[in-house]
UniProtKB/Swiss-Prot annotation:
Transmembrane region(s): none
Highest taxon of source: Bacteria
Gene that encodes it: cvfB
Family in the record: Belongs to the CvfB family.
Entries under Pfam families matching the protein: CvfB_1st, CvfB_2nd, CvfB_WH, S1_2
Cysteine pairs bridged by disulfides in the record: none
Descriptive protein name: Conserved virulence factor B
Organism, scientific name: Staphylococcus epidermidis (strain ATCC 35984 / DSM 28319 / BCRC 17069 / CCUG 31568 / BM 3577 / RP62A)
Length: 298
């Protein structure tokens, strides 16, 4: 039976018409047959046959129409950030708050696979229903972001570091959106590497335009550039995946062997890196921060 595309991916009032085993049978506005797993009922004591309730309607992988009372933040009419669960040859699988995951097809992702999102990243998406009534994730277009971002029309954010996620990647630069809703553009000349789609990055604000869009940079200010000892430590941290088993109480001989510097020089260097929020100093180790990783070149 073909599904009614009009109700798939949206919140609808459906009538409960019966119970078959552990599955409630529902009827849509155009007499569509919709199933509801009994475990999906929020309050069964207040759930009666013959009554209408609000549900989110979605297809399972076999094409059967199901409903849930757990309303997702993302529908076919609403955009939001969704967490990436995994990546495979078909594309990126995301969690939109439904009993099943949703696929963003590989055709909609960057051509360079190293720029694809990784598990734990977040994508700004809505739901798309295709001609076979299957449900996919659709990335937000520039037009959509322009309709929802929060403009900044003064210099209040100048030189501030802001956490934001990449929602669009072009050769000319990276387009980011922050949790506060700020839209940020980083020109290719202001970055050493390109962030992944959906990756959270730290960006320094360097200006704004007449539309209230912010301009950003991944490059450090001149006074934030590292001295020779700091650069040695930073480069080794990058080489060893952001973590080294050294701290201010490590032995002078071990420091000399690995970093070729005195313990005093090492302590001064990691102190400067810590003050610049490039590293964290923990018991027995130093690690790169998000700000530190933002300095990394390809």
């Amino acid at each position: 039976m073909a599904l009614d595309k009009d109700i798939v991916g949206s919140i609808e009032f459906l009538e409960v018409v019966g119970l078959q085993g552990s599955t409630y049978l529902l009827k849509g506005p155009n007499d569509e047959s919709v199933k509801l797993n009994q475990s999906e009922v929020a309050d069964e004591d207040d759930f009666e046959i013959g009554e209408e309730y609000s549900f989110f309607v979605y297809p399972n992988r076999s094409g059967d129409l199901f409903a849930t009372q757990n309303m997702p933040d993302i529908t076919k009419d609403k955009y939001d950030f969704a967490k990436v669960i995994k990546t495979d040859r078909d594309g990126v699988h995301i969690d939109v708050g439904l009993p099943r995951e949703v696929l963003v097809p590989w055709e909609d992702l960057p051509k360079l696979k190293e720029l694809w999102p990784q598990a734990g990243d977040y994508l700004l998406v809505t739901l798309r229903i295709d001609s076979t009534n299957q449900m996919f994730g659709r990335l937000a277009s520039e037009t959509i972001v322009e309709s929802m971002f929060t403009p900044v029309n003064d210099d209040s954010k100048q030189n501030e570091y802001i956490s934001a996620r990449a929602y669009r990647l072009l050769r000319v630069g990276s387009f980011l959106l922050s949790n506060e809703g700020y839209k940020i553009f980083v020109h290719e000349s202001e970055r050493k590497h390109e962030p992944r789609l959906g990756e959270e990055v730290e960006v320094r604000i360097i200006g704004h335009n007449e539309k209230g869009e912010l301009n950003g940079s991944f490059l450090p200010l001149a006074h934030e550039r590292l001295d020779d000892d700091g650069q040695v430590i930073f480069d080794l941290l990058v080489e060893y995946d952001g973590e080294l088993p050294f701290w201010d109480k490590s032995s002078p001989d071990a420091i000399k062997e690995v970093f070729n510097m005195s313990k005093g020089s090492f302590k001064r260097a990691i102190g400067h890196l810590y003050k610049k929020k490039i590293i964290n100093i923990e018991t027995g180790k130093i690690t790169l921060t998000k700000k530190g990783w933002s300095r990394v070149d390809d």
